[in-house]
Amino acid sequence: MNLSEKSVILLRSFFYLVGLYLLYGFLFTALHNLLPNLDTSSYEQRFIMEMLTENPLRALIMIVIVAPVIEEMMFRSLLKPSHIELVLFVVIWPVFFLLRFVPLDVHWVLKLTFTGVFLFTAVYIGQQLIPRERTLTVRNWLSRYEFLIWIITSLVFGFVHITNYVDHFTINLALFLLILPRILAGFMIGWVKINNKNLPWAMALHAMNNGMAFFFIYLSL
């Protein structure tokens, strides 16, 4: 499959995703009319909204560039993975949790630079410590069960975004409805990864999706 064909899959998937969002919006409105006591307005993405208001440039970089790269390493790297993608998966989760110990008052540019250098170093070390032949069995197993992995990673991807709305993980109908678009996005991004067989394509669709969301949210401020 050449670059042009992969680009068509990317663009087609983006428009399919937009269509799914429109269908979701219609059903969401209908459900609200059927269940007037269903309260979703009490849940807000406070951190994201504050970042958009106080520092739009930071929000743009974090939402459209950083989040797609990091999150695709965490989730879609398990779909038909290459050796380097499996190394990325092994490395990114420990790095992600270690970064939570970085003080909150560290300037975001410095934190982002540190994250990039730290991640690059960790991936390099991971490649040296994990030979290609050692990952072959795992890669073959993951490829064999790609449909199951696709479902699981899409669902987990959606559910981890619950913490956008609440400090601690909890679930109810209102929160499920709020994260449902992330689950839909997870499936479509995974579809692109499976078909284009390369993680950057998944990152690209994720960035396009987040860019669209950023645009509409910023206009609404």
Predicted features, each with a name:
Residues 49-69:
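Interfacial helix-start motif at the membrane-water boundary
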Residues 37-55:
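Perimembrane loop-to-helix junctions flanking transmembrane segments
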Residues 26-39, 85, 218-220:
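Membrane-helix interface motif
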Residues 1-7:
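Short, Lys/Arg-rich, polar N-terminal cytosolic tail immediately upstream
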Residues 5, 44-48, 166, 182:
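Membrane-targeting and insertion segments and their boundary/processing signals
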